[in-house]
A protein has these predicted regions:
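A short, surface-exposed alpha-helical micro-motif characterized by mixed small hydrophobic
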Residues: 93-95
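H-loop/switch region of ABC-family ATPase nucleotide-binding domains
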Residues: 87-88
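Conserved signature/switch motifs of ABC ATPase nucleotide-binding domains
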Residues: 26-29, 47, 79
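Helical segment within the ABC ATPase nucleotide-binding domain
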Residues: 67-79
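Hydrophobic anchor residue at the start of the ABC signature
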Residues: 41
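Catalytic Walker B motif of ABC-type/P-loop ATPase nucleotide-binding domains
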Residues: 52-55
Length: 136
């Protein structure tokens, strides 16, 4: 068990890692949605996980906040953190993922490295999805 001083030191270390150490003494209601997500990531990092699970980490965030959260997640990936991410942010997935798994109605429809997934999808469902999201 950590002492109070050790816990505060560790908390500050992870708040710095997610780029919001200046928010340490604020209540959740005083933080933006993106800041709240980054606090959640910092809180999880305090447990020294081997893998982190993210379920739509950018849902309900505005574009600026989405960038803040995705930048933190890119940093985690670059540091070697294993992440399982459910996302509709295809640009982020293309950049960070080692492996893409596309699901439809609870079933795995396609599994491939990002380059193959985006450039040479096998299933008709994946092709349809990509044609709809990549046209804008």
């Amino acid at each position: 068990k950590l002492s109070k001083a050790e816990a505060e030191e560790q908390a500050m270390k992870y708040l710095e890692r997610v780029q919001i150490p200046e928010q340490a003494h604020k209540y959740p209601g005083q933080l933006s949605g993106g800041q709240q997500q980054r606090v959640a990531i910092a809180r999880s990092l305090c447990m020294n996980p081997k893998i982190m699970l993210f379920d739509e980490p950018t849902s309900a965030l505005d574009p600026e906040m989405i960038k803040e959260v995705l930048d933190v997640m890119v940093g985690l990936a670059e540091s070697g953190m294993t992440m399982l991410v459910v996302t509709h942010e295809m640009g982020f997935a293309r950049t960070v993922a080692d492996q893409m798994i596309f699901m439809d109605e609870g079933l795995i429809v396609e599994e491939a490295p990002p380059s193959e997934f985006f450039n040479n999808p096998k299933s008709d469902r994946t092709k349809l999805f990509l044609s709809q999201i990549l046209q804008h």
